[in-house]
């Protein structure tokens, strides 16, 4: 009784994928007895007529995978009740998994062995969700080829392959011919249904307040003249006289806030690796500046620089906008220096301006903002808001989408209650997820690789919401 196995024949030289065993009967042997043969990656079996009497004519060859077999001895393979007769010996016979070969390419982004492994992994994952073996084999090679075509380096190939394998599991193999998730047809394609779903995602007043949003126009307390002029530096936490903010000093700080390292079990600064327990100079700060900076959080303090505006009196039709701002430290605190607004329905940027701050510039935060220079002709916040706070753009009926929108609305000096904040919708435990991580996890998109781009961030936050509502990201007509 022969074991039940799958058998595939490849007429060209190929890598042998894994170790298998099968029973083989040499039809030219007078003894007609069966012989069990092992085939592994580093060895194969050929039949050499000159050695027919030795080991029944079978000779093991090592490390010769790419050389074609030239012997012409014919043989018969009995496998269960199926008989394969008169197979030329140059054929490589494999059993177990089918032959999985990547599509040949002139310029391969990764070594051939890596591509073979990826095809195998795709096939293995697809078998969990689909039963049609020929379809799975074809899909595995096609999807791997799609990954290889867009990859420029070995690293990008591995990254894109991991995304594909993740999507196969996430969508249970329900991907299109390019390896992308299939768009589910639903009523969400209708604009009215999309609006209904978007309204269900709006944050309530309690959630807004808990996450730092100003939910109404608060009464501003009169500024106490006897109040101390000393404030805490936002970067190094040193107390300093805000009236002397432009006077040169030494501000040592870390570019990134400390986080807990699970391996070292210490709170460390990811910008330089220094920990709170270290006593080196770098532990005090890996960056040095000539001025301290501050950031008002109080409604009254913020209003003393630029008054807030409520959108209650700004009439207009209901629209959906995604926005993001870039900020800088100035002598007047934390000010907006760029604003980008994107239309949800068309995915087009409808407003994008560099804003001239009211205070004297101390730090443009160029590493994060991407702004290195602001021209004197750039509009101020008072001039710019006449363009973006209007019936045709941001009005009382606008649904605003963004990530960490409390910061954006604060520097824009806007009080609004129709807000969808991806930082709140997708928390990371007791903390908020970064837009960079959200974009990677949900959109399989890498952003903020270097300097931030407000248009890139606004579109990413918008696409996260579209993905949540199963809206095709390329849909621009409604």
From Swiss-Prot:
Role: 3' to 5' exoribonuclease required for proper 3' end maturation of MRP RNA and of the U5L snRNA.
Query: GO terms for CC?
Result: cytoplasm; nucleus
User: Cytoplasm among the record's keywords?
Assistant: yes
User: Where in this chain does the entry annotate a coiled-coil region?
Assistant: none
Sorted alphabetically, which InterPro entries does this protein's record hold?
Answer: Exonuclease_RNaseT/DNA_pol3, REX1-like_exo, REXO1/3/4-like, RNaseH-like_sf, RNaseH_sf
CDD domains, alphabetized? REX1_like (cd06145)
UniProt-annotated location(s): Cytoplasm; Nucleus
The organism is: Kluyveromyces lactis (strain ATCC 8585 / CBS 2359 / DSM 70799 / NBRC 1267 / NRRL Y-1140 / WM37)
Q: Identify which top EC class this enzyme belongs to.
A: hydrolase
**What is the designated name of this protein?**
RNA exonuclease 3
